[in-house]
Each structure stands twice: as C-alpha cells, then as structure tokens.
C-alpha cells in the first residue's frame, strides 16, 4: 500500500510530496490527537495545505481513503486550523483595542485642551478717560507697584494677588496662577493681564479715582497670550493670540504698550470719523443750497479738536517711539514689531492722518468762505457810509446855495 502511495505522490509537485511524506510517515500516537487544537475556521489565512489535500482526496482511488486517510486528513486540517488560531484569537483583542481607541483619543484631546487653557493668559485693553494721574495712583498702590526697568514714564505696572511674583526670574510663569497685572498709561489706556471678565470692573475702579476726562462710552479690546515652556522657538503666532516660552514683566510691558496704543488710537480714529461725517453733511448742504450756516466759533472748535487729536496721537501715545525694552532685547523687539503689524498701528495712523488732512482742507475752505462773507459785509458797510457821506455833502451844498 505504501508503494502505491509512493507512486501516486511522485506525480505531484515537490511541495505537496514533502507534505504527504511528512504525514504518512508520521509516527504520532492516536492518543495525541486530542491534544491538537481542533478549531475550524472559515477565515483561515493558510488555505493552501487544506486545498491540496481536498484535491488529493477527490482524485485519489487509493484504498487508504478509509479510516487512516481520513485520520491523516483530519489531522492536517486541525494543524492548519491551529496555525490560524492566534490570528483569529487576536482579532477580538484588536477589535477591543479599536473600540477603546476613540475614547482614549478623546481623553487625550480633552487633556490637551485643559493644559492649553491652563497656559492661556487673557489680555483685556480698555480706554475710558483721556488722562490718568499716575503719581497719585502709585501713592495709593505702593504695595502693588512694580518698579520700572526702562526710562519710559508714561505708564506704570501694578501687580495684584497674594502669590509671590513669578516674573522675577526669566522662566517665571503667570498662567495657572492668581497673579494679576495691570498696565496703566497716562493718556487713559488700561491693559489687564490674567483678569477674569467678572473681575474687570473691580480693577477699573482702582484707576477711575485718579482719571479725568471720563468718556461717555468705554472702548475695549481683547487678546490672548499662551505660555509653553517646551516651545522650540521663542515665539509663535496664531489667530488672535501669541504663544511664548514664558511671560515676565518685560513681556507684559511690551504687549501692554502696543495694546494701549491700539485701543487709544481706535478712540481717536472714531473721533476723527465723527468730524469727517460732520463736514460731509456741511458739504452736502452747501451743494444743495449754495450756503452754509456754520458759525465761525463752531468752525474754530473743530480746528482745535483736530489739532489736539493729532498732538495726542503723536506726543501722548508715543506712536513712533520704540520701547526701551524692545531696543535692549531682540526677543521683545520681535514681539513689539509683530503686535504693531497685528493691530495695524502704522496703517491706522496713516488712515487717521489722511482723515485729518481732509478735515483740515475743509476747514480751510470754509474759513475762506467765512472770510469772503465778512469781506462782503464790510464792503457793504463801506458803501453805506460813503453813500451817507455823499448825501450829507449834497445836503450841505443845497443849504449853502439857499
């Protein structure tokens, strides 16, 4: 019987022959069969041995296709299935990992957002007066006053909170602490760092007692600073925020300077817009009626207002003066330049200057009209006086002739 099997096996390919010889020459005991993992799987990734044996059984007329042939065939199927058992058993574990993966990702994302929120420092800028007495403000807040590090004298920095100052070292962190910083400028701007929105009024009242020229409507703006000690570069920028390795008092002064100028420039820009609108209405009436009813006093008031705005922007705001801190350290110079571009200070001043020139042109034009009107009145007065003098002369001549 083995000879017939050997003859038949020679007709098969070398791989199949090696497999068949290993099976038929196997000396396994029947008692060892139950130890095999009889796991039938239709998803087996190793179907080649099974397919070979099914073909052999179908075409073979050998009498071994009885108990022994069936036993060997069954053994090989069991072996083939046992090789796929780890794959099949690994699939539920993989599916379980896949089911757990979204939850872990969501948890990591939420933790990342929480860490980002902890490292975020809200910055709020306000403009509600045209002047602040910095000397009296310092006198009443000596315990909160931070001495200046530059020669700039148009602002002061106050720190509130019971925590030790985290900015006395270059690697101090403000985010995640209760430390609050307030930069107050003598021209009326206030910039708050790390202050919650519901606490703003409390800190504005500290300055309000030393302010003059309170405005009927307060201007405000918001920004955000994010600290990241692991940042590869000193600074990264984003939409409505700037990310730094750390934020100290020099950074607070630099950022506060630009935001204070920006919010004040916005206020003055709106004042000039009101003047432009008023002159536009005058020109429209002049176009329709050919005359205007503005008094000389009102015109002079507009001239004075335009000159004051221009002087405040150039002198008080120090719009073209680079911060001393930015001059000394290139890192803060980088912040200063970026924020000026971000808030478009140069472009805003250019627009304001252009509008002021429009106002100046209209003022000069209206002054000429008023001057011509005054000249015409004087001319008529002179004509009347000359006429009266001629009339008196004729009267005297008539009396003398009589």
Curated annotation (Swiss-Prot):
The keyword Mitochondrion applies. It is found in: Mitochondrion membrane; Mitochondrion. The keyword Membrane applies. Keywords: Abscisic acid signaling pathway, Membrane, Mitochondrion, Transmembrane, Transmembrane helix. Disruption phenotype: Decreased abscisic acid (ABA) sensitivity during seed germination and seedling growth. Abnormal mitochondria extensively internally vacuolated and characterized by a reduced ABA-stimulated reactive oxygen species (ROS) production associated with the inhibition of ABA-induced AOX1a and ABI4 gene expression. Highly expressed in germinating seeds and developing seedlings. Also present at low levels in seedlings, roots, leaves, stems and flowers, and barely in siliques. Mediates abscisic acid (ABA) signal transduction through mitochondrial retrograde regulation involving ABI4 during seed germination and seedling growth, and leading to the production of reactive oxygen species (ROS) by the alternative respiratory pathway. Required for the maintenance of mitochondrial structure. Belongs to the RMD1/sif2 family. This is Protein RETARDED ROOT GROWTH-LIKE. The lineage of its organism: Eukaryota, Viridiplantae, Streptophyta, Embryophyta, Tracheophyta.
């Amino acid at each position: 019987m083995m000879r017939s099997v050997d003859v038949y096996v020679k007709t098969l390919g070398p791989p199949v022959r090696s497999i068949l010889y290993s099976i038929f020459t196997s000396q396994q005991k029947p008692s060892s069969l139950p130890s095999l993992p009889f796991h039938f799987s239709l998803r087996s990734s190793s179907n080649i041995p099974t397919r070979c044996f099914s073909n052999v059984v179908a075409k073979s007329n050998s009498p071994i296709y009885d108990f022994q042939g069936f036993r060997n065939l069954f053994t090989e199927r069991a072996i083939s299935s046992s090789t796929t058992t780890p794959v099949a058993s690994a699939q539920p574990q993989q599916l379980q990992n896949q089911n757990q993966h979204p939850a872990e990702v969501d948890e990591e994302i939420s933790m990342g957002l929480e860490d980002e929120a902890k490292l975020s420092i809200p910055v709020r800028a306000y403009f509600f007066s045209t002047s602040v007495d910095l000397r009296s403000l310092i006198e009443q807040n000596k315990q909160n006053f931070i001495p200046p590090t530059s020669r700039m004298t148009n602002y002061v920095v106050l720190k509130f909170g019971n925590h030790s100052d985290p900015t006395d070292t270059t690697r101090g962190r403000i985010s995640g602490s209760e430390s609050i910083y307030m930069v107050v400028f003598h021209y009326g701007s206030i910039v708050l760092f790390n202050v919650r929105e519901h606490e703003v009024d409390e800190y504005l009242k500290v300055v309000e007692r030393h302010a003059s020229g309170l405005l009927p409507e307060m201007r405000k703006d918001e920004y955000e600073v994010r600290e990241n000690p692991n940042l590869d570069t000193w600074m990264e920028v984003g939409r409505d925020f700037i990310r730094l390795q750390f934020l100290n008092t020099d950074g607070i002064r630099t950022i506060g300077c630009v935001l204070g100028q920006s919010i004040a420039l916005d206020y003055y820009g709106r004042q000039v817009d009101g003047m432009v609108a008023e002159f536009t209405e005058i020109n429209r009436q002049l176009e329709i009626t050919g005359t205007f009813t503005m008094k000389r006093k009102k015109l002079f008031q507009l001239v004075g207002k335009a000159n004051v705005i221009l002087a405040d922007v150039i002198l008080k705001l120090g719009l073209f003066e680079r911060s001393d801190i930015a001059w000394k350290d290139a890192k803060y110079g980088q912040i200063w330049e970026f924020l000026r571009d971000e808030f478009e200070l140069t472009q805003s001043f250019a627009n304001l200057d252009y509008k002021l020139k429009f106002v100046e042109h209209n003022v000069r034009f209206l002054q000429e009209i008023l001057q011509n009107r005054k000249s015409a009145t004087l001319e008529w007065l002179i004509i009347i006086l000359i006429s009266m003098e001629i009339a008196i002369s004729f009267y005297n001549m008539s009396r003398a002739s009589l």
